[in-house]
From Swiss-Prot:
Protein name, UniProt field: Leucine--tRNA ligase
Record-stated family: Belongs to the class-I aminoacyl-tRNA synthetase family.
UniProt key word Protein biosynthesis: yes
Main location: cytoplasm
Binding of ATP, residues: 622
Protein's gene: leuS
Any one Pfam family match given in the protein's UniProt record, by short name: Anticodon_1
GO process annotations (BP): leucyl-tRNA aminoacylation
Key word S-adenosyl-L-methionine present: no
CC annotations in GO: cytosol
Coiled coil: none
Catalyzed reaction equations: tRNA(Leu) + L-leucine + ATP = L-leucyl-tRNA(Leu) + AMP + diphosphate
Amino acid sequence: MQEQYRPDLIEADVQKYWAEKKTFKAVKDPFKEKYYCLSMFPYPSGRLHMGHVRNYTIGDVISRYQRMNGKNVLQPMGWDAFGLPAEGAAIKNKTAPAKWTYENIEYMKNQLKVLGFGFDWDREITTCKPEYYKWEQWFFTELYKKGLVYKKTSTVNWCPNDETVLANEQVHEGGCWRCDTPVEQKEIPQWFIKITDYAEQLLSDLDQLPEWPDMVKTMQRNWIGRSEGVEITFNVAHSDQTLTVYTTRPDTFYGVSYLAVAAAHPLAENAAKNNPELAAFIHEAKNTKVAEAELATMEKKGMATGLYAVHPMTGKQLPIWVANFVLMHYGTGAVMAVPAHDQRDYEFAQKYQLPLFPVIKPADNSAWDFSKQAYTEHGITINSAEFDGLDFEATFNGIADKLEKIGVGKRQVNYRLRDWGVSRQRYWGAPIPMLTLENGDVVVAPLQDLPIVLPEDVVMDGVKSPIKADPEWAKTTYNGQVALKETDTFDTFMESSWYYARYTSPQYQQAMLDADETNYWLPVDQYIGGIEHATMHLLYFRFFHKLLRDAGFVTSDEPSKKLLCQGMVLADAFYYTSPTNERIWVSPTKVTLERDEKGRIIKAVDDEGHELVHSGMTKMSKSKNNGIDPQEMVEKYGADTVRLFMMFASPAEMTLEWQESGVEGANRFLRRLWNLVFEYNQNPAQTALDPTALSVEQKALRREVHKTIAKVSDDIGRRQTFNTAIAAIMELMNKLTKASLSNEQDRAVMAEALNAVVRMLYPITPHICFQLWQDLGNESAIDFAPWVIADAEAMVEDEKLVVIQVNGKVRAKVTVPADMSEDEIKQVALAEENVQKFLNGLTVVKTIYVPGKLFSFVAK
C-alpha cells in the first residue's frame, strides 16, 4: 500500500477495472430481487454542471447501496438529445444540430465516467437516433387509431424570434422564456394527445404513490384541477344565440350581475363586426398573452359588447362584457360574474361601475362591508328566493337541481388540465408520423415506412426548419397515392415520457418494448430529478405509463414507486459595474475574499483588481457566471472528494451551497481515512476478533462501530438522509483515530472497524474504498461485497465506565455492570483507595449521580 493518497492514480485504475469487467451490467435474473434506480437523463448541452453531478451522485449512492444489499441493480444512462438549444448552437457555430449533439454526448459521457458513476452503458439511449424514435412514431399512430390523438386549429403562444409555439409555462411576463421577445397569438393546426381522458386516473392514482414527495403530488393535483360544478346555458336577449358558462358556485347564482367572455369567443367576435372600438380591444386582448399564473395580478380590462343575457330564474337582463381575464381554452371561454362573492369579478365591477348583488352572508351573522371587498367564503344564502336561509351544500344542490329541472343546467366534473399539444414547428425533433393525401385526407404512416427519419446533414439558416424549407423532403407515397409528410416535429417531452421503459430492452427491434424484460424491471424503484419537472415531465411520465399499460406493454399502474427531488446547487455570485453601467459577472474561481470573524464576506476583489459586489448565494447559472466546472474540481481533488462533498454538505432535497472550503474538508477526511488504514497496515491483526476477550475500552469502541453501522444503514436505506450517515461515519473516524493499536485485540477491533467504514463509504466514495478494501486484505472486489450488518450483541452495554469525583476533581474511574444501582456504585466508589485518601477526615454532605457516567462526593 502506498503511503500517500493519490486519487489521480487510483480513480483511473478503478474505472478501467469497472469498464473491463462490465461491473454494472444489468441482466434479468428471475431468482433475484431487482432494483431499478433512475436519474433523469441530461440534455447534452456540452458540459456537465454541478446540478447533474448532484443528481447522478445521489442515484449512484442508492444503486451501490442496493447492490451491496443483494439486489439485482439496473442503473442506466442516456441522452435527451432533441430540443431547441441544439438549433441555436448549430446556427452560432455553423454546424448541424446532429453533429453538435453527438460531439457533446461524447464529451459528457467521458465526464460521467470520470466521476465514477456505475451506469450500465450497454443500455445507453440517445433519443435523436431513429432506432429510438421509430417506436415513438409507431406508438403515436396506435394512439391515433384508438381515438386518443386529434388535430385541431388552436391559438398558440408564438415567439416570432424563435418561430416556435410556446407552452403557457414558457411565457414569462408576456415574453418568450428563452429570448424575451414579446409573444404573439397565432392560430395554427396542431396535433394533440387526449391526456384529459386520463385526468381522473392521473388524479386518483396519486394515492398509489406514498413515497413521492407531498409537494409534487399537491402540484399535480392542482394542475389537474378537478372541480365539481354546474354548466349553465343563458339565452342571449333578442337573438337565438346562447352562452354557456361553468361554475363551481351555483349557490351564488342569484348574485350574477354580468357575464364575461374571452376575446376569442365567437359571441365577442360577432359583436365586434359593427363595432370598431370593440374590434380594436379584442385584437389587443388576443395579442397580450399571459401565463395563467399571472392572471390574478394583471390589470383587469374589459369592454361591453352591447349584448345582454337573460337570467333563467329571475328574467333579469345581464350585460355581456369581453374581459382579458377570461381564457378561451379554459372551460367554455365564458364566465358568470358575481362581484359580491368573487374578488376578481369585484375588482372588474368596481372599475366599470357594474352593480353587485349580495346573496351570501357570513354563517355567524356578522356584518360584511361590501364596499371594501367581496365575501368569498361559504355561508348562509340570502336574496335567493326559496333558497334563503340554506347553507352552502343545500343551496348548491337545490339550485343545481332546479337548473337541471328547467333544462338550462347540468352537473359536471371539470378539469383544469388541457390536452397535450405535441406539435412543434422546429427542425430538431422527431418527425410526426402523419401523412396528408391529395384529397386532403390525413392517414397514419404505416409501420413499414417507419421511422420517418429526420435528415441530420443539414444547414441551419436560423429562419426556417430545413424540412419545411425543402419541399422535396415532405413528398412520399401512400398505397400508390401521392402524399405529404407532416413537417412539424414532436414536443421533446414525448421522448422523455417513455425512455425509462425503453432502458429495459434498448436493443429490442421486434417491438417498442420486450414485455418480459420490461415487466421484470418496471416499475422504477427510485426516480431522482428536480422538482421543476413536477407538472410537466412527471405528469407526462405517469400518463405515458398508463398508455403503455393499456397497450399491453406494462402491468403496473405507475412508472415509479419512489421519487426524490434533489435541491439546486448554489454558489456565490459576484459582479462589478462597467463604465457603460453594465453588470459584469465574475466567476467565483477568480475572486479573492476577505471574511469577518463570523465567516461573512466583507471584501471581494477579482484577478484584475475590480472591487466586487457580492450578490449572495444564487443558483449556479451561465448568466451569473457562478457555475463551477466539475471537471476542474475532479482534477484538483478527485471524484471521490467531489462526491463526498455533494452528499455531505446538505440534505438531498435541500439546496446545496457550494463552498470550496467544504470540498477541502471532504478531501482532508479521505486523507485521514487513507492514513489510518496505512498506519494499521504497518502492523495488522494476526488473529481473529474474540468478543469475549475484549477490555472495556475495546468493547466501547466496538459498540460505537456497530451503532454507527445501524445508523448509517437506516439513514441511507430508509431515511435517505445521506448527510447524517456521513456525519456518523466522521464521528466514528474521530474515535478510531484516537484508538490504541498496542495489542492484538486492539488491532482486531480496528480491522473490523476499518472494514465496516470502507463498506459504508463505498457507495459514496467508491474509488478510494475499492482500493482500501484490497489493502485491508480482502480477496474479492468490494463492488459485490455484502453491506455490513450491525451486531445487536455488540451494541448492548453490559458495562459502564463511571467517573468518581471528590469535590469536583476526578479521583477514580470504575467499570461497573450496566444495571448496577446507585447505592452499589457508591459502595464501589468508597472502596477505591484514592477516593478514601481524599475523603479522609471529611464528612460527606451530598452525593450526585449522573446515571452510567458520574458519581460525585461533596465533602467538608
